[in-house]
Structures are given as C-alpha cells and as structure tokens.
Amino acid sequence: MPGIAMDGLSKLEAESERLTATIKSYVRHRRDVESSDQLRASPDANMEASRTKSVILASIANIKALLGGPVELLQDLARQVEIVACLRWLAEYQILACIPAEGGMSIQDLADLAGVPDIQLRRVIRLVGTSGFLQEPMPNYVSHTPLSAQFVTNQSWLDAAVFMAELAAPTALHMPAATHRFGGSRHPTETAYNLALNSLQPFGAAIQERPKLGRQWSAYLHHAVGLHQEKKIADMLSQLKWSSLGNSFVVEVGAQSTSMAHHLANKFPTLHLIVQIDRSRASRLNPDYLWPGEMMNGLTRDFTPQPESSPRPGSASSRVTVTYRSASMPQPVVDAAVYILHVPVLSTNSPAGADAMETVKTELQDYLGILRATAGILLIPTANLLPEPGSLSDPNFEAVARTRDLNYLQLANEGEMEMTDLFSAIETTRDGLGRLVITNQLRSHIGLTVCLTLKHETYC
C-alpha cells in the first residue's frame, strides 16, 4: 500500500489533534446543555453545537481523504450502492414499521409478518447494521437503533431514500448515454431521466401530476441534497439589524412565496414588507412551484400593493402586502429602505431561452439608480447558490450542493448558479456615476455565504 508523504503526515497529525479537541468540546457542550433546562436553551447554544459537529465531520472527511486510496474509495462506493438498495427494499415491504419501537423481535417472525424470505431479510439487516441502521442485539433477533427509528416516525426521511433509489441513482447512471445522444441540449425532455424511464414527459411535469413523486422529490431536496428552505434562510437573515430600520418599507423581489416576509414581520413588529411574486422565472423543480392557497387570496395581477385578505389590525399579516411583478417590469417601489432580491437559482428553460445570468445582470443594473437616490440597501440571499470551490470548512457541504446541481442537470437539464458568477455580475454593475459594491457577507458556521449586502458607491 502506498505510504503518505511527509506533508500528508503533518496534515494527518494536525487533523487528529483538531478532531480530538473538538470532540472533547462537543461532549462538554452537550453535557452542559442536557443538564440545563431544555426550554431555556439559547439559539447560540444550538448554533455552537452545530458548529462543533460540522468541525468534527469535516475533520473525519479530511482524515479519510488523507488515508484513503483507490481500494477504499471503491469499497465505500460499493457499500453505499447496497445500502441504498437495502433501504428501498425495506421501504417496499414496510419492514421498518413492523419492528416494535421498543424491544425487538425475531428475524423469522419479522420475515413472516412482512412476507419476505428470511434469508434475504437477515442479509439486509446485517448490512445496514454496519451503518448503525437497525441492529441484531442477539443472533437472529432485530431491533431499531435511534437512527432507524427516525425513519418510522418521520415518513419524509424514507421518501428521500426511496427517491434516491428509484430515480436519482438510475438517472445519474444514464448521464453518459444522455451525453452521447443529446450532447449539450437544454431541452427538458432530452435528459438522462427520460432515458432512464424511457419517457417523453419532462420531470418537472411528472412531479406536478404525481403528488407522491412530488412529495418524495421535495424530501430528497431538503434531506439528501441540502436545499435550504425559506424559513431557514429567513432565520439566517434575522441576524441582520432589522430593528434599526424602524417603520421602513422592505421590498422582497422575485419571491416564490410569502413565508420569508411573514417570518420577518413576526420577528420585527415595525417592519412593513411588500412581496413581489415572480412566477415567470420559477422552475417547476422548485417544491414551492405550486402557490399556497392562502397566498392566492392576496395575489393581484397589477402593480398596486394589496394587503392579504382580512388581516387582523396590528398583526404581522397586516404589514405584509403581496403583488405580482416580473423581472422585466419597472420597479414601482422606489423609496424602500431595503430590497431583498431573489436571483433565479436555476437556469430555467424559458420559452425565450433567456439566460439566467443576463436576467440577473439586467436587474442589478436597474437597482443602481434606485439605491443611488435612496441610499438604500440591496440584500441577495445566496444560501442555495453553489459555493466557491474549496471555500467551505467542511467539504461534504460543497459535495452535497454539487450533487444537487448534477441532479437538476440529469433530471431536467437545469443547473444552479455559481457564487463566482454572481460575484462577477455584481462587479461589472456600474454606470457613469457609480457602481454596486458588496459591503457585507453573512456567513453560516461552515463558511457558507447565505446573504450579500450591497449598496451604491459613487465614484470619487
């Protein structure tokens, strides 16, 4: 077996020391939290737990990369393939739900109850058990582990695993054939997905027509490939100093729902928010593509802000106004203190074939004059954009995001925007009087840029 070079040994030693220190810190922190009143646990305490957990996982990933070789990589891939197949098999026969939540049962009784051959069941249990999923506390006897029990109490976890086995994996394996046949096509029916299923229907249409598939896709996006939900992004944005704005107006541009606005309105009672819905650049792959019924009640097809129906006076809803506005239309609100601009995460296949980056550049250019006149601020949520290569402390987080990006390509010939492309677009946004500049980057505990703060800067 090839050895590790001297610089590799130094890195290995440093990672092992960091891992040891972080594990001790994590254990000490968790003990402090568990010994205190859980109801009084602060958000900072939970954030610190997440941070130390991420550091531990990053160190483990780095150590594996330093020690691993071709054999270790192939063995790990072979194991993961079979784990995915086993999860699909367990879901097909609803075996997890048959195992008592407390205690366990004999494998033979479980096989009889599920109607499967006991020899197959035993093999599956013993493989997934190597990953802490189910256990055999005594020969031929099975019980849940804390990990496997969660797949019974939360159907969404199992939905994600089933989608991975039934669609994500087969589709990914058809990528070479799709490239041979379709080249660089962006048409939504010329994809690896269409070849894998031998179907002419776009994936985006399939998840709209089949609710179960749509549910599984949403679960896969959020649990397996790290798509940040709007509530989580809103939690991150809440770290900004919104209370300093007083009774100012905030305009959310290019929104797909009102969830972020309501979150901010609930948390900051002096804010007034105008939500500008833009479905023209929405992707059908977005789980929020179908409009919630409560949002439709307040949606109008003109550009005059309309409050949502029958809000209680003084409530958060009374301070949230919903309008419809596409990116190509002039911004009617030119005196807001803050504009939250949602850039199109996906390079959607629009009828006109418009490029997402050109849309972003045009919209950024439009805000030059507005920000110059008002000294306002432009916020761009970026949690779901692809991070700069190598910029995150945990490489697994970047791997998860890039897995999601390839899923979009293989399923629908779509793709996510790179942070580097957005930085380039901002850098070139200027006119004869000034330019847009980034004044702050709000980052998560792993170094992910979740929001950019921009303002207009006049030339000296």
Swiss-Prot record:
Uses, biotech or industry: Notoamides have been shown to exhibit antitumoral activities. Notoamides A-C show moderate cytotoxicity against HeLa and L1210 cells with IC(50) values in the range of 22-52 mg/ml, but the IC(50) value of notoamide D is greater than 100 mg/ml. Moreover, notoamide C induces G2/M-cell cycle arrest at a concentration of 6.3 mg/ml.
Keywords: DNA-binding, Nucleus, Transcription, Transcription regulation
Alphabetized InterPro entries for the sequence: SAM-dependent_MTases_sf (IPR029063), WH-like_DNA-bd_sf (IPR036388), WH_DNA-bd_sf (IPR036390)
Top-rank taxon: Eukaryota
One GO CC term, this protein: nucleus
Signal peptide from the UniProt entry: none
Stretches the record annotates as Disordered: 300-320
Gene Ontology terms, MF aspect: DNA binding
All residue ranges annotated as the HTH iclR-type domain in the record: 74-145
Cell compartment(s), UniProt: Nucleus
The entry's DNA-binding region: 107-126
Function: Transcription factor that probably regulates the expression of the gene cluster that mediates the biosynthesis of notoamide, a fungal indole alkaloid that belongs to a family of natural products containing a characteristic bicyclo[2.2.2]diazaoctane core.
UniProt cross-references to PANTHER family, sorted A to Z: MONODICTYPHENONE CLUSTER TRANSCRIPTIONAL COACTIVATOR MDPA, PUTATIVE (AFU_ORTHOLOGUE AFUA_4G14580)-RELATED
Protein name, per record: Notoamide biosynthesis cluster transcriptional coactivator notR
Source organism of the structure: Aspergillus sp. (strain MF297-2)
Species classification: Eukaryota, Fungi, Dikarya, Ascomycota, Pezizomycotina
